[in-house]
Each structure stands twice: as C-alpha cells, then as structure tokens.
C-alpha cells in the first residue's frame, strides 16, 4: 500500500528545437490553447517553455536558450521528443521518498515553488532511457499551471478538435528490456499488469512486437512497454530504438468523444495521416461484427497522425 496516490497524468514535457514554432503547430493544427509561458521575460535564463492545454491534456514544449545544457544534449541525441511524463499526486514528498527507497534514482528532491497564486511541490525520478517522471502536488495552488510561469494573453483562441485526456503513454525498449522495465514499475510504484500481448498477437508478415501495459491503482495511468520481436523485416520498435538512440516515449495516445469528428477537424487543419489499407476494412465486419458507424467514413485514413516524435494516437 503506497503512502501517496497518483491521481492522473499531470502533463508531458517535450524537449524541442523550437518551442515557439512547436506551440504554433499545436495550436493551429491540434487545437491546443497556449495558457502559460516561461522564458527570459519571467526570469528563466536557460530555457523557454510554452504550456499548451486542451481539456485535461497539458503539454509543455521547451527549448534551450543557451548552449551546453542537458536539454540541448537531449535534443542533439534524440531529436524532438518527450523528456518527462508527470503525475498529479496528493503528496509529493511521500511519492519521492517511497519510490527512491524502493530503488528509483532521484533527479531532484521535493522542492516547494511558489508565487502570488499559491504554492506547489515537485520532485523528479528517473525511469527508462533518458526519460523522467515528475511528481506534482498543487493542492494549494490556484494558478493556471505552476509557479514560475506567467499566464499567456493571446489574441487568437485555439479551436479545440475534441481531444479530452491522455489515454496512455507508450515506451519502446531494446530487445530484452521490456520485462525489467515492467518489473521496475511494479517494484517502484506498485503498479499491476493491465494487459499484455506477444509476437503472436501483434505481428505482420514483416514486423512484430511484444507489449505489456502497466497501470496504477485507479488505472488512470496506463503505460504500455514495448520491445521488438523477430520478423522478416526490422520491427518498428527496433527502428525507433535505433533512431531515438535508446529507450524512450514512442507515442502519446489521447481520447476523443467522437474520433470521426476529431479526425475530420485535424485533417482540415492540415494534419497528415498514414493511410490504412483497404483490406483492413474489407474484413472488418467479419472480424468484429456489426457496428453503428458508416464503414465508408471509417475507411478514410484515421490511424496515426504523421508528426515528429512523439507520434500522437487518437483513441
């Protein structure tokens, strides 16, 4: 029994080469509203960050302002990608103390941060690759995000596309690393195995993978852990690990109340989609039975959005 509770995903921070440009894309194409900012104007001399929000989803898009920083090295090595997956907790100090006592490596100890809107407590630990988890306790904070960020007063309001919350966050591992990472989440956080598949379940003639989904107690947090399996061609998981130069977040899945409307809106905003083979839809009814949606509408490309790392998946 943990001495703290993880309530939900708090936010994901992406390290990107141009935070301002990325923020523009997330607003104009994905419907995220910029709500907070941190940079030179707020006293941050090493990094600039834009906080983007749509319903319950928050992304922090950050870029370095000076050379030779850990953030700059991360971008040089991995390209644009997810650095931190943060959890909203009821007690940061207990979360940090318990996870580090169980073997997690600390990045930063619990720290009280405050401004005129109140106070929050944050702490960070390492997970696989160069990825981290930050515990965020904001029980006594009334601002839009966290102390140190100023509210963004923007003239142009984003047009939401129907994204509601983060459904799951997927981490890709080198071959043989999936089980140790899952053991880490079970030991450090007390999470349980929610679902699993092997190469017999997720495979094609050319590529395959193994996956275990780890979840917290209330199952608001789901983190599939993938590793490559042998196929006639290189697994997409292995391709990611080689391109990213190690383990990391492959994609962030976000829920939509009406995925058809969401996808249509995204396409009208200029988001590109990878095509789904027509053969998938030709056998769909035989595989899953009758359903209400118009198959002619479904057969339009609706799978993964074609973005820079990490890919975004709609569910």
Where are these regions (language model features)?
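N-terminal beta-strand motif that seeds the catalytic metal site of vicinal oxygen chelate
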Residues: 1-20, 82-85, 142-182, 245-255
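Conserved active-site tyrosine of GNAT-family acetyltransferases
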Residues: 22-27, 99, 185-186, 266, ...
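Conserved small/polar residues in nucleotide/adenosyl-binding loops
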Residues: 305-311
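An N-terminus-focused feature that recognizes amino-terminal "leader" regions
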Residues: 1-128, 136-139, 146-150
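A cross-kingdom feature marking solvent-exposed beta-strand/loop segments within repeated
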Residues: 37-47, 65-84, 102, 106-121, ...
């Amino acid at each position: 029994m943990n001495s703290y509770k993880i309530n939900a995903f708090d936010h994901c921070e992406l390290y990107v080469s141009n935070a301002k440009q990325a923020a523009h894309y997330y607003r104009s194409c994905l419907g995220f509203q910029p709500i907070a900012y941190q940079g030179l104007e707020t006293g941050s001399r090493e990094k600039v960050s834009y906080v983007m929000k749509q319903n319950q989803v928050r992304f922090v898009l950050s870029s370095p302002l000076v050379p030779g920083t850990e953030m700059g090295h991360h971008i040089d090595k991995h390209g644009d990608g997810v650095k931190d997956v943060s959890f909203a907790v009821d007690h940061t100090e207990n979360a940090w103390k318990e996870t580090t006592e169980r073997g997690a490596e600390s990045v930063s100890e619990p720290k009280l941060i405050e401004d005129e809107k109140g106070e929050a407590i944050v702490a960070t630990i390492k997970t696989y690759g160069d990825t981290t988890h930050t515990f965020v306790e904001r029980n006594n904070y009334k601002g839009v995000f966290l102390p140190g960020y100023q509210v963004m007063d923007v003239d142009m309001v984003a047009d939401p596309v129907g994204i509601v919350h983060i459904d799951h966050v997927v981490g890709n591992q080198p071959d043989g690393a999936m089980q140790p990472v899952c053991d880490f989440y079970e030991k450090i956080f007390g999470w349980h195995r929610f679902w699993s598949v092997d190469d017999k379940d997720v495979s094609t003639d050319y590529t395959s993978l193994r996956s275990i989904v780890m979840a917290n107690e209330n199952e608001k947090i789901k983190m599939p852990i993938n590793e490559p399996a042998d196929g006639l061609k290189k697994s997409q998981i292995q391709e990611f690990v080689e391109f990213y130069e190690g383990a990391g977040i492959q994609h962030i899945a976000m829920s939509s109340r009406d995925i058809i409307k969401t996808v249509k809106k995204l396409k009208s905003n200029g988001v590109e989609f990878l095509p789904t083979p027509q053969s998938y839809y030709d056998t769909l009814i035989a595989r899953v039975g009758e359903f209400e949606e118009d198959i002619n509408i479904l057969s339009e490309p609706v799978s993964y959005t074609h973005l820079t790392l990490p890919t975004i998946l709609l569910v």
